[in-house]
Amino acid sequence: MSVTEPLILRRWSSRIRTEDCEAYVSYIRGTGVEDYLGTPGNLGCEMLLRDCGDGSTEVSTLSWWQSMESIRAFAGDDVERARYYREDDRFLLEKPDHVEHHHIVVEGLGLRRKLEQS
């Protein structure tokens, strides 16, 4: 891949019970984060939490990718479908069917620099 091709941000969001935040973060570190970082072409990931003030917390996962082919290696052929894990039903209040993909047009995290050095 040429480093001038657009990088891709994959975004997924849902909600959990606020009381489950610590357990959910620990669970995701051992499932989703390991899978993201173990997939060739993944450039990193983050999980964001936002307390909604009603006993629920919004969870957003952002992951950065070199290409749609890299995402396909992580997500399967239907890259638009959300990927779930065995214990997700224990935590998630809703399970959206789809994720969002965005082309990164301005990047200040050093992702391109990492690609150029590899």
Model-derived regions: residue spans:
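Short, surface-exposed ligand-recognition loops at beta-strand->loop->(often short) alpha-helix junctions
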Residues: 15-28
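Short, mixed-charge, low-aromatic patches
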Residues: 3-5, 30-31, 41-43, 59
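An amphipathic, aromatic/His-enriched active-site/gating alpha helix that lines ligand/cofactor pockets
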Residues: 27-42, 64-101
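Residue-level signal for secondary-structure boundary sites
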Residues: 20-22, 69-71, 107
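Short, well-ordered beta-strand segments in beta-rich or mixed alpha/beta enzyme
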Residues: 8-15, 44-78
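Intrinsically disordered, low-complexity segments
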Residues: 2, 11-12, 19
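Glycine-rich beta-strand-turn "strand-cap" elements at beta-sheet edges
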Residues: 1-7, 46-57, 83-118
